[in-house]
Amino acid sequence: MPVRRGVVIGLSALGGFALTVLWSAPFVDKVIGDGVTSAILGHEAAEAPMTSALAGIAFAFASGLGGTFTACNIAALGAVAPLLGQQRSLRSRFAQTLPPLGWLAAGMAAVSAVYGVVAALFGTHLPQYSTATASSGLSPRLVQSMVVFGVIGLILCYLGLAALKIVKDPLEGVERRFPHIRSLVMGLLIGAFLIGRPFGLYRQLFRDVADSGNPLYGAFAFVTQSLGNIVVLAVVFLLLSVAAGGRVQRWITAKPGRAAVITASAFLVAGVFTFLYWDVRLLARTGVIWYPTITWY
């Protein structure tokens, strides 16, 4: 590849690290997350009554959309660049835009639905159900977040290195038989966010699903929550692909290796951020290690 791969890796890792230093969970979760959800619902999200399955599903979508830019969902934005790297003709640009989004949504829905059923049947015994706070150390639900997002972060980093041909690409052979495998895998990862998500409004939904004991409601609510998470991602992808797709595609293909660099950078920034934020910065809350942060909110 006619680029210095070390530079791409270094700058991407630096970008992911810088994002963890600057990230303000109170601002993103409360101001943006709660604010957007409350605006959609028309009342304070924290006081939203889920008196029926329909009300719960409406809350699920609103809180999913509101949680688009929370730390547990930021890795999903790394899915946009790999999708843009795919070839598509000018005449059928819109038609060719839909299958990648469809497979991404399918993978996401599969994991979300299964976990929704698990939450409905066994949720009262899972860490995400608990409202307890740890006076020192980490609560069980944060330990669960560390494990889930740590694994997701490492997977994203590996995919970034694979895009640069530094490690073997596990999807390359499958892609020849199933061209949309990468979109499906990204969907599976986005769906798995629910397994580790500590976002307050999501846990509010989780408790309602667990208390209901209704697997069908759990599946629908969790799929709807995940769909809300990717609305912004889908809009950005459609705008870049359809409205500016010709210019974007020409720019990506103008230089050999540019598509791979963009894909790798997106995966590496998202992966480094996800791993460092959830497995290193979070650990610093216990006092075991020190991690640099800039408090601005």
Positions of predicted regions on the chain:
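Hydrophobic alpha-helical segments characteristic of multipass inner/organellar membrane proteins
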Residues: M1-Y297
